From Swiss-Prot:
Protein name: Altered inheritance of mitochondria protein 9, mitochondrial
Main location: mitochondrion
GO cellular component: mitochondrion
Pfam families (UniProt xref): APH (PF01636)
Sorted UniProt keywords: Mitochondrion, Transit peptide
UniProt keyword Transit peptide, yes or no: yes
PANTHER family given in the database record: ALTERED INHERITANCE OF MITOCHONDRIA PROTEIN 9, MITOCHONDRIAL
Family statement drawn from the similarity comment of this UniProt entry: Belongs to the AIM9 family.
Transit peptide location on this chain: 1-39
Compartment(s) of residence: Mitochondrion
Amino acid sequence: MLKLATKLAPCSRVVYAISKPSILVSANQRRFNSSTPNDTVYTSLNDENDPQRDAFFQYTWGTWLKDDKEQKQKRVTRFSIEGVNSLLAKMYDTSRETMKSSNVLTAPVWDKELKATLLPSNLDLDTMGVLNPNEKIVVTQMASIHEGKHHRVYKLDTNTQKSFVLRLPYNLDGDFYNDVRVKSEAATLDFLRLKLGMKVPKVFAYGADAQNNALRSVFTLMEFIEGDLLMKRWNPLVKDSEGSQEQLKSVLDPLADIQRRLLEVTFTKFGSLYFAHDVEESLRKDLPYKGEVDTMLVNRWKIGPSAERVFYRDGLPAEEVTKFTGPWKNAIDEVVAVADSALNSVELSLQKDLTQEQETILNRAKEVYQDFRSVAPVLFESDLTKSSLPNGTELFLPRLHVPELDPLNVVDNTAGPYLLDVEGANIKPFILHGYPVFLSYDGPKIYNVNEDVEGYSEMSPEEQRSYDVMYMRTRNQFIWEFALNARCRELVGAVAPAVKMIREPYLAAVRRGADVHHYLNVESSLLALSQMWDSYRAGHLVGAEKFPVKWAETEEAFNQKVQRHREDLIAYQTKIASAPFSATNGWVPQDMFNTLKEQGIIVQDGEDYVIKDE
């Protein structure tokens, strides 16, 4: 009989047991302080269709004011518990075979019955534990320990006293992306552990093709790592005081150390890492990097299409997406691909049934991405012998980029920090990496509020607070840059002011989300770059004599462009200012949602919710 938790506390750790009814464990996570108790029900282990199981797979950490049912449906992580047990049984049997050749690194193995890939070399006695004669390995307890932005994580305990992590992606960007990302993530973690000797979880098995694999869900089964997230110590808005620098560096230094390791290997192409059997035959002949002396590693990984999320955001079919995902021999080709992908997305959206307002906005976005497409091929000087950029060759070499480098994805284990998540990891030149997302800030740089902000001392506390936040975010970036300089001095040119401005249209396009108004960020960066183009060309930082769009040819045309951009930006800012929770696309943490609903501040409006007017 299976014990499940329902009416889940927001952001709580939910556990149910498979065996005798045992004590239900619920340990609240720090991120939200919920004290809502969990109710329990039971389900038969032999009945996959028992509706009692359903609540365990539902998304519970928040509610959307608009399209809540649709958003939550995308985040349902239903999987076959029976399939998990079948997978564990195969892993257990494989571990016994591995014991016979413990010193041999074997290639990943495709299991025809499970329709999944196993990594035999990671399966041993220590991993799987020991069973009594005639006993089968089974899951005895499951815990939902994390509901993230893009995936959900379950902890599985077994009757061998060993625990595992089951990681399931949400279906936010379509089946094809989930298949791509799970294959690339597994290979990237394997590469980091075996080639670079980094602390990452071992991958035991992974499966794409949710319709056919044993779990009936795209999944990764991996090592469970004990410890606290670095996020527990991360306070980006801590005020300057004795010990504040040390507090910030206690998080940023371990992350900078991880980044230094990620950058050690330079590759032969731009794209993403995969196991050899997961890429097309034509891509298997090329080595991912040069100089490998370990014969067991030589053909283990290959470079295939980029797994960066920007190419997959629209949930398009494979044949539509793969036109843009590489792999590429030249760095600038990836920049062009990002522009082409963004433009393609807008053009496909224009074919839908639209309101006049939607069509107008999309046509504006199309104009901007066409401008970016014109600039992309010459965004940087291709002849690095002419460029005034220090260490330009180093900055343009293919290096591993992990977008999820974040204190939320690093566990402080007794053995040291472990990087848990490499979703969307890709190979691109360091000059195009940008800041880690948790440090990103594009506003005014303030290094000292009293010196850089006129009249700061006479401002009200509320006004001062706005500038304080700008200062703190600038300070955090500066600490990160200092850490980069200490560890990778040859790459510090990537944070030069000119380089930041040149690459910003590209980074803005990479960051584009579901809101089509993101074109305004791309346009803003293009406008700023156009004004500095001649200066940057003099130093051979950019690749064309003149900024390659027509509105930059005359002062009148440029001013008209600026005015139109300003009007669009004001209209958009006015719109989102009147939309509650616009920064989270209408998502409200569940504890907060429950409180506001009880207070009558949030009220139901059909299938949506609205904020009640005073």
